From Swiss-Prot:
GO terms for cellular component: cytosol; periplasmic space. Substrate binds at residues 174, 349. PANTHER family: ALANINE RACEMASE, ALANINE RACEMASE, CATABOLIC-RELATED. The active site is at residues 75, 301. Its main location: periplasm. Changing residue 393 to Y: Reduces the catalytic activity towards L-Lys by 2-fold. Loss of racemase activity towards L-Arg. This is Broad specificity amino-acid racemase. Optimum temperature is 37 degrees Celsius.
Amino acid sequence: MPFRRTLLAASLVLLITGQAPLYAAPPLSMDNGTNALTVQNSNAWVEVSASALQHNIRTLQAELAGKSRLCAVLKADAYGHGIGLVMPSIIAQGVPCVAVASNEEARVVRASGFTGQLVRVRAASLSELEDALQYDMEELVGSAEFARQADAIAARHGKTLRIHLAFNSSGMSRNGVEMATWSGRGEALQITDQKHLELVALMTHFAVEDKDDVRKGLAAFNEQTDWLIKHARLDRSKLTLHAANSFATLEVPEARLDMVRTGGALFGDTVPGRTEYKRAMQFKSRVAAVHSYPAGNTVGYDRTFTLARDSRLANITVGYSDGYRRVFTNKGHVLINGHRVPVVGKVSMNTLMVDVTDFPDVKGGNEVVLFGKQAGGEITQAEMEEINGALLADLYTVWGSSNPKILVD
């Protein structure tokens, strides 16, 4: 029945409008995170600190010292922090440029009242590009074929589309023209010669967070942009050159060029030692109940943990479906009342168990910190990354997309 209703609705749209409905990604929330009810009855939630975010923006702007413009990268729903929550701070701090990946992100950025520069930082499909014309978004272009197709779309709508020509200067081999070959340079020249595309920027992206590798990619980018500007007879004063992500922005100042694209640094996700940037996200849950079990009992699926003593185990209302992955089985820790307690047994779909035997004050209803700080304790980025075997962004983008979010200050 649901399928038949959907089919009927689609048929009605086609009958009434003469057009097939455009299906897109699930709508992102415009919630600004100020309603406590969004997390009060939730099993797990993400807290986002507006003060930390605004502090990080100001710190970054001060470091740039007006020599490079800041483009705030808010892809993946602002790295899981929620574009609806983040945009008021972006606007309040006067950030001139926002970068996104999806049309839905672009919609929320514009709906928030942002009228500045909006850029997509990945290759779009042709249907995405056409739909995004309504958001006045600048598009990444990295092939002559795509440029011709984009030009045709812009012409059909009577528009001129602003584009950023991407180079494969550091070997990402993902979006950019390969300027190390003559055929690639020929493609770049063709891209600059499309009637309905306005070239406003030249860009690249660094493949490795390593200073020497960044400098090597930067040298290639500088040579390649110089060549294209000369041979395509471009006006350098009308072009924005940008390459630096958060790592390059903070660690290789010469890579900042005209504009930097920072995402992680805005949210406090930086290299070790950059303590001036504050973490903007915490991931939390609650204790459902505390149970007593005798020594010798096993815990969880597949009996991966055996109690060595009579124990008190707290049942936490979060699991791998909420983004707390099974990799933390018998390895992770959480904070309850400031106590650091270990995860025991396999993380389940909706539940995990922790050993609170040594802490009689732990009881049902207590707040649990899965990532972040509590009463002097901390679950750190380093330990989460070591156990997960990947960057923290691999986790917090999922936490944010799987759980409600709230601003805490």
